[in-house]
Amino acid sequence: MLTLTRCHHLKQIAQECLSSLLVKVQSRTQLLLPRASARAESGKSWHSTHSLVGDKNIVLMGPPGSGKTTVGRILGDKLGCCVIDVDSDVLEKAWNMSASEKLQDVGNERFLEEEGKTVLNLSASGSVISLSGSNPMHDASMWHLKKNGIVVYLDVPLTDIISRLKSMRIDRIVGQNTGASLRDSLKHVRLYYKKWYDARVFCESGASAEEVADKVLDVVKRYQDVDSETFISTRHVCLKDHDKKFPPKYFSEAVVEGLASDGGLFVPEKEFPKLSPGEWNNLIGATYIERAQVLLERCIHPADIPAAKLGEMIETAYGENFACSKVAPVRHLSGNQFILELFYGPTGSFKDLSLQLMPHIFAYCIPPGCNYVILVATSGDTGSAVLNGFSHLNKNDKERIAVVTFFPENGVSDFQKAEIIGSQRENGWAIGVRSDFDFCQTAIRKIFNDSDFTGFLAVEYGTILSSANSINWARLLPQIVYHASAYLELVNQRFISFGSPVDVCVPTGNFGNVLAAVYAKMMGIPIRKFICASNQNHVLTDFIKTGHYDLRNRKLAQTFSPSIDILKSSNLERHLYLMANKDGQLMANLYHQLESQLHFRIEKMLVEKLQQEFVADWCSEGECLAAISTTYNASGYILDPHTAVAKVVADKMQDKSCPVLIASTAHYSKFAPAIMQALGIKELNQTSSSQLYLLSSYNALPPPHEALLERMKQKEKMDYQVCVADVDVLKSHAEKLIQNWFVRKSE
């Protein structure tokens, strides 16, 4: 193994970095993650005579007609504090005329400037301030207000706003351009509101002012309670000594560390947030980006990532990187079956839905002064998606974060290998391993749990290891969004009404994708059954049917659907933890037994509980190819082999009493040889690029994936490394890359 003597100051920095990750700090000001600095910079202290506001203000923001004035008065009564309405108490008194008269007098631009200057003179503490609808369009005045308060956005449905404005005989608002409709103008000013709010009240249609005021109090309480949303290991045991050794983590810490130090996976300590039916209804006509922001705001505390920053990340991830404007559209296949198309991202697989966002979350959460290496095991699609996602970081972040992807050299399709190699960038490398995915995944876990090695990297190179596999909570979280969005799309397209149940069928290997659907149900999406679809490596199907997870005498089979050629299903542990009422000791026992004896069995009560929501079956190679052929002949639609596995199992298991959403996890062109075999195309001995162009000529659905064609061209120019299946060898490769990227660059 390589060693390199570094100077004393680097060792000191590295040791401080490591301790910032591994030691639970007691004070918010001591924490080196953004959660602490964000709280310190905002200066929001909420302990004073008023239980919520103290000497700070609650600042209500929203468009005209959102109810700010009425809600502000109710809050003032509830909190016993002063209420300031900017329109009537500030602007009209300063101008000696109404805001509408002033607007008529000076016009839009001058009005906004004079309004902003007037608000800059406002000085208040311990008050509720109801802004005008146009205050957020003046940056300086909003910064002034934010310094001494929490800005709460009253996000009221547009239909309600327009109805209220009509009843008030208002047909124009500040900032409305000539010829623009009221609806379009309201949509435009929303962009300003999203820039400033600290917390959002997502108002149901027709909600009373009293109900909205109660929600304001709820979001302010959540905002001030920075310790309320923590994460624990699935192997957490409620004992004093254990709590000291393995304390709860904040979201930022869970993201950076990736894997819990006791070998378990991070999960929320408390229940998942749940949206009401009315809140879900507000999202039916929303864009994917809007849905993502509302849902992820509920799951990530603003002390970890402020709402405005989270919104920027989501816009960056999904704004222009997907070939379809809907990001994850739903297409009717036939009968009661619908395809959730998850392959429009830059690498053509469902992994892009997480890995276009997760790198930005990770880069924001890491503490200063350290370098990070993301270790990834891939069964095919994850590797290229991780490499692509982290390549989109800004220059400064790329200098601090590097990616090493290990993939089974002979266990992915030729196209997947080409794509992984072609996705390498200056801060990301691919290494083929002469073994299978399970070895790669197990090896990475062993590396993470090797405290001598991780400590050595921290001290010698100032570098910390982390993960981007679905064991990382930030990888799993964005997947909840597309399962929820798929249901909302069915409602939006009027196939169902909200509240009607659906089944979800997912080709399953590592259990993360289907687990995200479970979490979507916990948030309020009415999913009836989860259909787990396996290929010939059907250990999960057998487990769901019997409760016995048995790896003895099993050998991993290479199939047409390599991304689910997995025997050790990591995320199953998270679901078992939920079913077992968060029994961390049971999880530790089960997975220690799996490690030592290659099997475990859960008790009958848990099997029955599992089978209440889960059904499972598997698909042979012949059935997979037949499904591709028959579906294409019937509809002109080409399924990739993983989606074909799900289609076969959905046909077997679904009772057709409700719609079934089939997760299509990859674009078919990534598996051209299997597709050509299924469709009876004889020209199999072609290059991967030629196969891709040949399939494109069929004019089938879905359309060709242009980014994949481009990636194939890049592959020819890139080298990659191959190593034997030895954990120490993988460590050595990781260390060499750390030297090449971080150490030599700094010398």
Swiss-Prot record:
NCBIfam families: thrC. It comes from Mus musculus. This is Threonine synthase-like 1. Keywords: Pyridoxal phosphate. The modification N6-(pyridoxal phosphate)lysine is found at K351. It comes from the Eukaryota. Belongs to the threonine synthase family. Pfam families: SKI, Thr_synth_N. The gene is Thnsl1.
